[in-house]
């Protein structure tokens, strides 16, 4: 017996059998040791016996018992599992004879399985024969398995039933009802049929964006083959989807991958045109399995494709086709392109209506038609980086899964009742230990409450169980209907008209009637604890979760918040009514859903002197909308003064450092499409920056350096500038009004600085007024209240007299600098002295500091707060 003349699988099996013998302290390798390896799950031997009707669990138990009967030998100088037992040696001797007779170069597993029958008295042989597996039957199965081939390589077992092992029969999947229906795409399916019917170049490749339904077209073809809705030349053909991953996985030795692929191709060749091969992600064949000196899958396929011996359908995306397939011209010309475009919203709704029943059965929910329409329209509008119908199907699936999880979870009412009951029971247990009258009285009250709650709890639980059962009945009946329809389809395909008639006119109408009655009952019962309907509201919630864009119906609290948005913004931004109003209106328009869907929510240019609240307004808006001013894309345009720095907004071009990182503007918006973009000090930027902003302002879109389209339709663009601020400072009226002449002067300076095509695209240009003395007082009030809030954490109260506030306002106010000097002045005259007093221990906790003005100087009076 030469181990080198065995196949790799056989060598590994013998090695594993030796390990069993060593672990069990058996001196020699016996027949049961080796057979224990042969019947391991998914092994060649296990599949062989299973196909021939042997109960593997029963057979494995027998092998284990036989191993247990072998005596263990103990000792210090004993070697275990180094030799074969006489029985096993006889099996190998007989196997050698059979292999020579069959003309095999290597000893393979199936020959060893056949040689076992030569051991007439062996319990394993007796078991197999008693269960109907004779030597003749096993030999016939081996001949069928091999298909007349001889074992000429060490990977022989890998090549048996190669298509079954490395592929999925799509036609068989359709027959078993494991495939979703394919709706529409008739034109593309006809194109594929036309290409498959050609004499040469009869290999279609489906090219389209990810998620448009390329694989579904092949599944649709498989469904047509089952329905016999194809030309004569395609009737009774089988489509096998080849799994390239499984083909490559575990190919350890050089040539093993090629051998597996050749085995697949030989099976296809032997089928004489009855098998159509489908390779999803076709580009993977270019370079697949290529190691030093070996061929890749693409080159192995070329000869058969050229001779027309292989019918192959491929599917790949546009980018991958260009990157991999077009580089290999010889391979590319053997395929005929079939372009698969993205379906329209209307087509997507039709597709969703076709899939609706499948999702209802899988999740056990009811999907309303308005949810399907919402999924198609909302995904098309808000999820811009993916394609229909995939993104719409995802929304339906996600919303259905959410409802399903809620159905299986405890309802809020029941959960609250349970928690309250637990709380009262804990209180009852504590009061039992008390002896005073008040506790006894309270205990009686609590026991009464517990009794009431338990009754309410039991009622709720019974109602919930009943509602769940009702929903479960609907789901079961839908499953029954689906099964009956599948049976009808099978009967029609087989030509069993009697069965088809019984199903169509008897069983199916009866189930439909029962289902309708159950659904009507559920509707009239008005399920209050179990929500089993998927409506447009759930779809909107899912879109909101995925994109961060709020599109759900407004709840009462949010309505109030939006209507009072100007007042809320004024709490942070003093004055500037026009600017606050314009920004608030843009947000209200967006949430009402009436803004132009092809433009940003709003684009504003804020003009005015420094320190009047331009940037502060953007921050206040971000805080109000997103609860944090960090949720704002702030770009300081002074960083973009050089021409070359423009590329940082959209990303560096290919070949430059930072190409992989993406643009600062595009990446921020791509990750968070609902945001506020603040372009601060825009006049400082290079003029080329404005060219990039043109399409953002007009169409709400921008293409980054990688060619990815970024959607700006859900952003608010705020640009700030100091252009013309001198006119505003010099010519503002006493009551803070800006004269028409001043406005015209500012606008003319603006037109001189920015191009007309840029200014023309901005929704509103707003002039910020210089701050009046009254505004300054309000700002001081705001700043001092912030300081007082910080001191509260140290248990110190702060009080400023009115004259101090007026004095700070008069001394700190400089119209040219706005509100910024106030902060500096307040730090100098209030915060610094306060800090020194705190560090010196003169302001202990639980004290009050009153700030007064004495002889034109600030005085701090520290008082203790009485407990």
From Swiss-Prot:
Instruction: Please name the CDD domains in this protein's record.
Output: AAA, RecA-like_ClpB_Hsp104-like
Repeat 2: annotated span: 84-148
Q: Where is this region: C-terminal?
A: 771-867
Using the UniProt record, give the first listed, main subcellular location: cytoplasm
Region named NBD2: 558-770
Signals that turn on the gene: By heat shock.
Query: Could you name the domain of life of the organism this protein comes from?
Result: Bacteria
Provide the binding site for ATP 1: 208-215
Q: Which UniProt keywords apply?
A: ATP-binding, Chaperone, Coiled coil, Cytoplasm, Nucleotide-binding, Repeat, Stress response
GO terms for biological process, alphabetical: cellular response to heat; protein refolding
Tell me the protein's name. Chaperone protein ClpB
